[in-house]
């Protein structure tokens, strides 16, 4: 696990700071999942010094967090986002089910961008169909994961979102380690 921006160091796995290839290989012998990066601002991890392509030769899978949403469940991306490594063969967009049924201005990071793209006011209530339309407009994903699907009606909201998308969609409750593929 690493980032192209900034993340808090993972507490559930070993974190290696500016590791050499040999250190990564040794860590992967002991643990199936590790976090690599370099210290950045505010105690966060920044991008690793080694290229993602090098990491991919060392690990079976490399998960790169490419963009944050300021702890909001939904996000509209600026033109320079997300920072996706050229080696990426999948982009999994994570959305939070808690963003549905509430005004865009309360649940979407960069709500003005989403409102403008959709031609709606920022206080428009976000529905799965509306958000599917927006995600298809952005077209920054190959798959979508709807987190927080354990909330009341969460699975149904995820199914409605999936109905409007042209890609595989999974519903999940990541903190409870539960996931269900919907399409």
Please provide the spans of the model-predicted regions.
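Generic recognition of cysteine residues
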Residues: 2, 15, 33-35, 105, ...
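General beta-strand structural signal in soluble alpha/beta enzymes
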Residues: 1-4, 34-38, 62-66, 72, ...
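Short, high-confidence coil segments that cap the C-terminus of an alpha-helix
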Residues: 29-33, 59, 88
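Conserved catalytic-core segment of NTP-binding enzymes
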Residues: 42-58, 67-168, 176-183
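N-terminal phosphate/diphosphate-binding loop that engages ATP/GTP or pyrophosphate donors
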Residues: 1-41
């Amino acid at each position: 696990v690493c980032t192209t921006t900034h993340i808090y160091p993972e507490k559930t796995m070993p974190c290696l700071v500016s590791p050499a290839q040999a250190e990564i290989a040794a860590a992967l012998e002991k643990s199936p999942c590790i976090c690599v990066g370099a210290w950045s601002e505010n105690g966060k991890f920044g991008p690793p010094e080694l290229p993602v392509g090098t990491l991919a030769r060392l690990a079976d899978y490399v998960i790169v967090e490419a963009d944050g949403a300021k702890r909001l469940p939904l996000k509209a991306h600026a033109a320079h986002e997300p920072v996706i490594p050229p080696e990426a063969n999948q982009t999994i967009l994570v959305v939070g089910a808690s963003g549905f049924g509430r005004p865009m201005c309360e649940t979407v990071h960069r709500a003005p961008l989403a409102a403008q793209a959709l031609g709606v006011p920022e206080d428009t209530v976000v529905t799965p169909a509306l958000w599917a339309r927006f995600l298809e407009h952005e077209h920054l994903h190959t798959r979508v994961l709807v987190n927080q699907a354990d909330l009341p009606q969460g699975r149904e909201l995820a199914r409605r979102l999936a109905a409007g998308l042209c890609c595989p969609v999974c519903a999940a409750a990541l903190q409870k380690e539960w996931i269900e593929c919907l399409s």
